[in-house]
Amino acid sequence: MNWITNYVRPKINSILGRREIPENLWIKDPTSGEMIFHKDLEANQFVAPNSGHHMRISAKNRLMHFFDDGVYTALENPKVVTDPLKFRDEKRYIDRLKDYRSKLGVDDNILSARGTIEGLPIIATVQDFAFMGGSLGMASGEAIIKAFDTAIAERRPLVLFSASGGARMQEGTLSLMQMPRTTVAIEMLKEAKLPYIVVLTNPTTGGVTASYAMLGDIHIAEPGAMIGFAGPRVIQQTIRETLPEGFQSSEYLLEHGMIDMVVSRLEMKTTIARLLRLMMKRPAVFNPSDPSPTDSQTSLSTTKAA
């Protein structure tokens, strides 16, 4: 059987000119079970077209869709000491880092860039959950602080997309130190009177929730995102009580006043640009596709003006 599989079948395929189908050509929507063509899903920012389910998206893909014409300049992340504790669990930490870096082609889980959205110059910082669960360590902490420093130096607002399981246990206290350090960077941005908008994506938990992810001027969440400090099972085992269903979802948190908005990824750029214009007192941009105000709205505005 192995001989047929390993030799005969490839030989026949090569003769007939048959090509192997890539494994990720079709992606299944976990909510509806629909099979979606990968290129269609990518063009739709990894939002399922029928169900609206928001799948995970890479940092590069997110920035490409977020910035005008997909054009941005990535900020160089600072270099930090690798594996200062010589940590080992099932695998050496340094080997784990090498595997992720080789697989994803990035040094860590933070990608920051400068660019424009609807003509507004901003700095955007994205956490990539694919790299060690978006965990907060020294490298990601330094990269976030560098983004805030750049925003202050260039007088740009900062938009941060969070996605994390919390602090990186392989770095111990050194990872926990990034929580107050990033908090100080946020305070410096606010002292400079520059806006800081946080977009909470699925999932945002642990030390990230307890620090920079919940310190924004405005908190926006993607639909269905899990947002919290500890996981639901940990909380339930601690307090010994049954918890409300979906109590850590973005919709539940919006209903209970923990966040300001739940916005689809497809409308995120327009929404944030509008918010930044309001916060920075910039003139609105006329969009011909927007419906014109009704007569009653016009007369009401005229009455108020009078």
Swiss-Prot record:
Region (Disordered): 286-306
Keyword Lipid biosynthesis tagged: yes
Record-given protein name: Acetyl-coenzyme A carboxylase carboxyl transferase subunit beta
Single Gene Ontology MF annotation: carboxyl- or carbamoyltransferase activity
Alphabetical keyword list: ATP-binding, Cytoplasm, Fatty acid biosynthesis, Fatty acid metabolism, Lipid biosynthesis, Lipid metabolism, Nucleotide-binding, Transferase
Extent of Low complexity compositional bias: 288-306
Gene name per UniProt: accD
Subcellular location: Cytoplasm
Origin species: Bartonella grahamii (strain as4aup)
